[in-house]
Amino acid sequence: MGLACVENKFLKLPNIQKYEVVSRTEDGFIASVEMDDGYEFQIYANFLNRVFPSTVIKLIEKQNKSQKVNILVAPYISERTAQICEDNGMGYFDYAGNCWFVGHSIYLSEKGNKNPGPKEQRSVSIFERTSVVSSRILRELFADVTKTWKLKYLSEKVNCSIGQVSKLMKVLIENAWVEKLPDGYKVIDPESLLLEWSKDYGKKEITSYACYSLDNISAIEERLKELKTDTGIDSYLTGLSGGVRYTPVVRYNKVHVYIAPEDIQEAIRYLDMKEVNSGSNVVIFPLENDSYIKDYRVIGESAVVSPLQIYLDCMQIKGRGEEMADAVLKKEILR
């Protein structure tokens, strides 16, 4: 199937005079291509049953040294792996018919075909909201993306086994988000890692309480401060209302806030709000575990979740959420 998915694409091109496989190799095959203008070249195909971004990066390094025309052939190629290939000029072909190849006067590009084979080779579970241990480890890594981390330190810091940390690191390394160095582990692509995290983070709709208050936004935020003083109930700003505390790049007309599940109804009564199906100006998220408020800060007397949590939450907000997430990422996380 790997041979056919490449051959079919090339033979459909009007400027291809001849395409044939001239030999098999240990990890693929070599094909000869002849153009209608007489130009000939060879393609060195690398076949892999499972492919990760880290695998592709190694192939690209090999290609750069050999100066050969290399392509990747695999049952499934993820969007990120495909992008890495394109950015580095390496062609790719998968069994669903998705492909990309640029060379001489050839331009092949087909995307969006659903893969009928095995599910995407990625570990979604590490990013799910329910993966509390993975979340804690990831949050610790993002406490300082310039730092090199030891497995033992991370396991002690988040109170889990070294095996759990090692398992997570394996996934991060396979996806070229983290690199293993002689003195520890280092995040090498924080933006891509966070983007992937935010995608899975928003896949499952979480419970939230949409409310309406007659007060304006600034008055609501002031009353949230009083909520702590008068009732002892903690609240933590997030979303756009939290993000502007770090970088005021957007205007907003809705307050997003975390409150412990057992305190939500009392908070709604104290704030004189009503739960509504539409037209809300306050959204309360249940504080399901403490990882959401790790490294929170007090800014202007308001408790605000960390820049990392702001990013994850803002990426789920339609409209200007992504703009806020990007601003917080650049100012607070990648600094």
Where are the predicted features?
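Loop-centered beta-sheet repeat module
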Residues: I137-S198
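Short gly/ser-rich loop at a beta-strand->alpha-helix junction or flexible surface loop bordering the NTP-binding
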Residues: K204-D290
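Membrane-interface helix-loop-helix junctions at boundaries between adjacent transmembrane segments
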Residues: G97, V124-I126, Y153, K157
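Hydrophobic alpha-helical interaction segments
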Residues: Y92, Y270-R335
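DNA-contacting interfaces and partner/effector-binding or oligomerization modules
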Residues: M1-M90
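Charged, structured surface patches that assemble and position nucleic-acid processing machinery
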Residues: G89-F101
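Short, charged, surface-exposed secondary-structure boundary motifs
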Residues: V102-I106
